[in-house]
């Protein structure tokens, strides 16, 4: 198996010294650099760079700068996704994001893990676990999502949370480690919106 194949199969792989992966990360960093230095008003150019980075045709994806990712091609984005400023997608493992997702500033999606034994860690070994984000979710600022986590549709993750385990659909979850506080009633029709139902 190539190191990329090992990475995608969630096996230990050479993250630091494999030339193909080094080149792929350099490609992504160059595109991120260009995106981060493109005027916000240059919407067509920004769309072109975002599509180039993720190697797909995105549908109403908005990314505020600065933004960073390791590869880009291992992120699968739905439509109507908003990524606020200073977010990082560590996409050695696949990061899947559904439709209508709001991601607050300073959020990180971290798919990588390293050996606890420093001898192995110093040799560059790494393993990546996927992250799955359901549609209609919202992340407050400074949220960290760790490898192997699935966050269910319609959930809200409070600011500053560290998500180490799966979050069920339609849940309000906060804290470090992130825990479900209560269920969210997502069946309320929009015309019932007021100071009480918006909580």
Swiss-Prot record:
Belongs to the transferase hexapeptide repeat family. This is Putative acetyltransferase SACOL2570. GO terms for molecular function: galactoside O-acetyltransferase activity. Its EC number is 2.3.1.-. Keywords: Acyltransferase, Repeat, Transferase. It comes from Staphylococcus aureus (strain COL). InterPro entries: Hexapep, LacA-like, Mac_dom, Trimer_LpxA-like_sf. Transmembrane segments: none annotated.
């Amino acid at each position: 198996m190539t190191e990329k194949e090992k990475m995608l199969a969630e096996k230990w792989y050479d993250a630091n010294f494999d030339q193909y992966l080094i080149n792929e990360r350099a490609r992504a960093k160059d595109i991120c650099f260009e995106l981060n230095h493109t005027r916000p008003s240059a919407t067509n150019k920004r769309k072109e760079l975002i599509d180039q980075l993720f190697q797909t045709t995105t549908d109403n994806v908005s990314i505020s700068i600065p933004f960073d990712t390791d590869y880009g091609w291992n992120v699968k984005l739905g439509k109507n996704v908003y990524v606020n400023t200073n977010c990082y997608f560590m996409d050695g493992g696949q990061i899947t994001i559904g439709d209508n997702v709001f991601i607050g500033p300073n959020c990180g999606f971290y798919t990588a893990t390293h050996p606890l034994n420093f001898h192995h860690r110093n040799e560059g070994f790494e393993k990546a676990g996927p992250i799955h984000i359901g549609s209609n979710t919202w992340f407050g600022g400074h949220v960290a999502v760790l490898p192997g986590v699935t966050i269910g549709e319609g959930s809200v993750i409070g600011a500053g949370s560290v998500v180490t385990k799966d979050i069920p659909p339609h849940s309000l979850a906060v804290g470090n480690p992130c825990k479900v506080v209560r269920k969210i009633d997502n069946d309320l029709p929009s015309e019932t919106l007021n100071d009480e139902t918006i909580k």
